[in-house]
Amino acid sequence: MADNKAKKEQVHDVFQNISGKYDRLNNIISFEQHKTWRKRVMKEMNVKSGSKALDVCCGTADWTISLSKAVGHTGEVIGVDFSENMLEVGKRKTKDMHNIQLVHGDAMNLPFEDNEFDYVTIGFGLRNVPDYLATLKELNRVLKPGGMIVCLETSQPTTPVFKQCYKLYFKFVMPIFGKIFAKSKDEYEWLQQSTFNFPDKEKLKRLFNQAGFSNVKVRSFTGGVAAMHLGYK
């Protein structure tokens, strides 16, 4: 429990500090590929108009905005994040989108009823929580029976060429970005640690199954540097 609390505090501090630069940093680090990955995931989801969606670890609300457009004016999207500063950025971006509500909350203890949402998403956020399985079980709790869970996250490359490029990127390129964007060494180191320590796509699929999700589909992007996990309750 002490380790979980320490990780929570560390991650909270990191995102509080980088919130103003997060969108730009995300674009640069992924070479804007995160936008392409999210579009492909949204196409795969085929979100129904009028539905209710929850975007967990919504950050500055990029995926929340995509979901808002998909559910339409008769639908509802709630974004939840535990960084107040990230939410403030998200609120500025979504101020004219009336089907979006952004709330402060913990992914491991969501402030929602059981079986409340048709869709639950978590994008580039699962790697930041202290307990992956406990978080997935909490997402399962708030999802309606038959509802869809989707995770878009960094992953471990599977092809030899991408594996080597991945290692070189983190060894030589990431330190440059860290010096430019991070206010402290802790922030830069967290970006590396959270990516390298995150389970590969097969291990993550097993966690989805353990959390109670079924028919879990996995799709890799850009040589395996990112992956989608899509399942049902």
Curated annotation (Swiss-Prot):
**What catalytic activity does the UniProt entry give for this protein?**
a 2-demethylmenaquinol + S-adenosyl-L-methionine = a menaquinol + S-adenosyl-L-homocysteine + H(+)
Q: What is its EC number?
A: 2.1.1.163
Q: Which GO terms describe its biological process?
A: menaquinone biosynthetic process; methylation
Q: Name one Pfam family in it.
A: Ubie_methyltran
Identify the metabolic or biological route this protein is part of: Quinol/quinone metabolism; menaquinone biosynthesis; menaquinol from 1,4-dihydroxy-2-naphthoate: step 2/2
Sites binding S-adenosyl-L-methionine sit at T60, D81, D106, A107
GO terms (molecular function) for this protein are: demethylmenaquinone methyltransferase activity
Q: Which UniProt keywords apply?
A: Menaquinone biosynthesis, Methyltransferase, S-adenosyl-L-methionine, Transferase
User: Which EC main class describes this enzyme?
Assistant: transferase
Recorded superkingdom:
Bacteria
The record, for HAMAP family, names: MenG_UbiE_methyltr (MF_01813)
According to its UniProt entry, the function of this protein is described as: Methyltransferase required for the conversion of demethylmenaquinol (DMKH2) to menaquinol (MKH2).
The record's similarity note reads: Belongs to the class I-like SAM-binding methyltransferase superfamily. MenG/UbiE family.
| Stated name of the protein | Demethylmenaquinone methyltransferase
Organism equals Staphylococcus saprophyticus subsp. saprophyticus (strain ATCC 15305 / DSM 20229 / NCIMB 8711 / NCTC 7292 / S-41)
Q: What is the lineage of its organism?
A: Bacteria, Bacillati, Bacillota, Bacilli, Bacillales
